[in-house]
A protein has these predicted regions:
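Class I S-adenosyl-L-methionine
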Residues: 1-166
Length: 166
């Protein structure tokens, strides 16, 4: 299977994950609450169906929060938390970026990553990280800022996978 097929698969049931919302019913058969999400349902002419929370209406966001307990974590918070994990692993701060908590932003470091004695980039890539925040994608990959919807340039991304690829 391809990457997208793998991402859509529920590894517990062996089936694809399902929509778990009625928000997409207007698109017809295969988009109701219990329908499995297929590659064709979200690609080609359907590629704009799934959108970041920040691009949805405020009414939709509020409704999903109230009715489905949907929450999101601002990108700057994800960054701060991942930086704490990296501080522990590297034994120092500001390895991948320099945070500005006052402005809720960060600036990527530009120098090559210096690994602690006895550790290599391979050790970092192989190091286990666990994302336990109910599927918060920004902790893994940060394509866009979750609060503004603005695209994050590749060199500024803060997710765990982003860092390992860097």
């Amino acid at each position: 299977p391809g990457v997208l097929e793998e991402l859509l698969r529920d590894h517990t049931t062996g089936k694809n994950i399902f929509w778990a919302t009625n928000d997409y019913e207007e698109f017809g058969k295969g988009y109701d609450f219990f329908s499995q999400i297929t590659v064709s349902a979200i690609t080609d002419e359907n590629e704009r169906i799934v959108r970041p929370r920040v691009l949805k209406s405020k009414e939709n966001q509020t409704g999903r929060s109230k009715n489905m307990a949907e929450v999101f974590t601002p990108s700057w918070v994800c960054n701060a938390q991942i930086n704490l994990v990296d501080h522990s692993w590297f034994g120092r701060k500001e390895v991948f970026n320099i945070e500005s908590l006052d402005s809720r932003s960060w600036e990527a470091t530009t120098v090559p990553i210096n690994f602690p004695e006895g550790k290599t980039w391979k050790d970092y890539v192989r190091s286990t990280r666990i994302e336990i925040t109910c599927g918060e994608a920004p902790y893994l990959v940060s394509r866009y800022d979750t609060t503004t919807g603005n695209y994050i340039p590749l060199h500024q991304r803060i997710g765990m996978l982003d860092r390992k690829l860097r």
